[in-house]
Amino acid sequence: MTKLSVNINKVATLRNARGGNVPNVVKVALDCESFGADGITVHPRPDERHIRRSDVYDLRPLLRTEFNIEGYPSPEFIDLVLKVKPHQVTLVPDDPSQITSNSGWDTKVNFDFLTEVLDEFNGAGIRTSVFVAPDAEMIEYAAKAGADRVELYTEPYATAYPKDPAAAVAPFVEAAKAARRLGIGLNAGHDLSLLNLNYFYKNIPWLDEVSIGHALISDALYLGLERTIQEYKNCLR
């Protein structure tokens, strides 16, 4: 079964726009779990423009499903993850100033750095995932570096899907097959939505997890959070 992890960064963005604690990030996360989410994802950035370090500490003891923390492995991020000990850490190559993730790691160029970071997290018993493009070589070096999983960067799929779904998904199917041959787990995320998720899943049914935030929270404005989560879960069947 492919798990749905809900990224709640956009909820924190809304809270921070006004100040105060509305919406309550922790309550929304717990409600997502109650409505069927299999996990919660957060991406704390150094400027805390959405998720704050305090949110991460508040969430950890209360969540009943898997907790995934994603981010660039700066010393501060590594320290946070080792203290919180989530179920999974996802390493992304973001510059702190980026609005959102827009590329995967070059795992060959960054092999030594990633190996060192992954070794630290693996030693703490935290499942590790590395954000990569759908490229067999990048997946191979992620596996060699010690990653338990890779997360495929799916924005190119989402962009190409409306014009030619088969062509859009083809490189991801090949990448997924490469991951399976290497014995490494497979996650996916970025711009997956109700429009394109089911087709992606049908072509790669051995996906372990998808992480979805922006589209899901946007859909919830119209459909409500509970119905939206169920709609996304239905796309993974």
Curated annotation (Swiss-Prot):
It holds the Pfam family PdxJ. PANTHER family: PYRIDOXINE 5'-PHOSPHATE SYNTHASE. Belongs to the PNP synthase family. Disulfide bonds: none annotated. 1-deoxy-D-xylulose 5-phosphate binds at residues 45, 50, 100. GO terms for cellular component: cytosol. This is Pyridoxine 5'-phosphate synthase. GO terms for biological process: pyridoxine biosynthetic process.
